[in-house]
Amino acid sequence: EPADPAARVVRTVLGDRAGREWLQAPWSGVPAALGSSTTADWPKQWNRWRERALEADPSRDLARVERAGGGFVMRSDPRWPAQLECLGEDEPLGLWFLGSLPESPACSGYVSIVGARASTSAGGRCARNMAYQLARAGYGVVSGGAIGIDIEAHRGAMAGDGATVCVLAGGVLNPYPACHTEDFRQMVAGRGVLIS
């Protein structure tokens, strides 16, 4: 939770492993290191995070994604998209990916094309044609995976043999919507990547 200041304190002061162990163990109070670090209501935070912490199994999740042909990257990885640094404290802590995540940009740059889900056929054609032309000019396309403009942008980029990055909210192993399963498969098989 990069935008959660209390979670940032736990990661900074305790570290990822010790923070997770604190959340997964029965309540035993606030670790001394956290006591003086902020005015957070630690018992309340602990209760808020605990259920998710008990379900978390990063090793299991990573193994599942790796078996599917993906992985997990953090800022220290050379494949980390440096453009995310502009988000400051809201920069993601890591990205799950499925497909090819190159160490250096596979193109001249990236352009985001997003729009309405309930787009007109003319709007869909426009997004597809724009993405196609950008791909032919050496640019990659970034969009979500939604019905409408988003998926048409990916289709155009793939038709132009371009790189495409599909940002998914529900995880790379649960791409949504299901009606785009074949598009997601083509992205991963080509020059595309699903990230979450």
For the regions a protein language model found, what residue spans apply to each?
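Short, small/acidic-rich helices and loops at N termini and domain boundaries
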Residues: E1-R79
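Glycine-biased, small-residue-rich flexible motifs in mid-sequence functional cores and linkers
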Residues: A68-S196
